[in-house]
A protein has these predicted regions:
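Carbohydrate-active catalytic/glycan-binding domains of CAZyme proteins
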Residues: 1-226
Length: 226
């Protein structure tokens, strides 16, 4: 909400923290936050995680290390030895025994509908309810950490009725998304590609982008440029 926006801080909505104390006695707070874009103040990247260096005062109060009250983008690192962790891969050919833990789905575990064992080298996604549902939706997603990205996927899908669709989606929530989808077009009498844009629950189908397509493998790409 605009009345809670502080233009002096890049990180907004900071809260819901987890307390961390290292073996060296260093104190940190890991917390949720968001980075809204001006002037709309919309948090396009959703909830993010930040870390702050903290300290205990002589009176027993937990305070930020620099005695400020604004969340910082950059903090002093711990003096503990580095502990490397695997980086999230830019490419996934789904040839492992299980789905990577960097995948998410709205409100349910993605393993409930996404299977990497049925056809090695592919992920098979079982359809469920519509994209606007608050219950069971088959959206296999990765979190964006930047507003500049290129996302590409190869898909095999043959829709048989107008209720069948699959594709590539840029998803904020069930009322806000952009979906490049393959579906069965009753108008064309065959499979087609089109783009659906949902903003605050209002749906716009960009019919000028609709094109007929064959039912073989197809590549879909999404370019995000700020």
């Amino acid at each position: 909400k605009p009345k809670y926006y502080n233009p002096e801080s890049v990180l907004q909505k900071s809260g819901h923290g987890s307390y961390v104390e290292t073996p060296l006695g260093e104190v940190y707070l890991v917390h949720l936050c968001a980075r809204p874009f001006a002037p709309e103040l919309r948090c396009t990247l959703g909830r993010e995680t930040a870390i702050q260096k903290m300290k205990w005062t002589e009176e027993g109060w937990l305070r930020m290390y620099d005695d400020d009250n604004l969340a910082k983008e950059y903090v002093e690192e711990s003096k503990l030895p580095e502990y490397p962790v695997p980086q999230i891969p830019d490419f996934d050919d789904f040839d492992g025994d299980e789905l990577g833990n960097w995948y998410y789905a709205p409100r349910i575990m993605p393993q409930r509908f996404a299977d990497v064992k049925a056809r090695p080298g592919n992920v098979r996604i079982r359809g469920q309810e519509s994209r606007t549902s608050l219950n069971k939706v088959s959206i296999l997603a990765r979190k964006l950490t930047s507003v500049y990205a290129k996302v590409t996927t190869k898909m095999e899908f043959k829709p048989e009725t107008h209720q069948h669709s699959a594709g590539l989606i840029m998803y904020y929530d069930n009322m806000n998304y952009i979906n490049l989808r393959k579906y069965y077009s009753q108008t064309l009498g065959q499979s087609a590609l089109s783009i659906i844009h949902l903003e605050n629950g209002t749906k716009t189908e960009l019919l000028n982008t609709r094109i007929p397509v064959a039912d073989g493998p197809i590549y879909l790409r999404l370019n995000i440029e700020g």
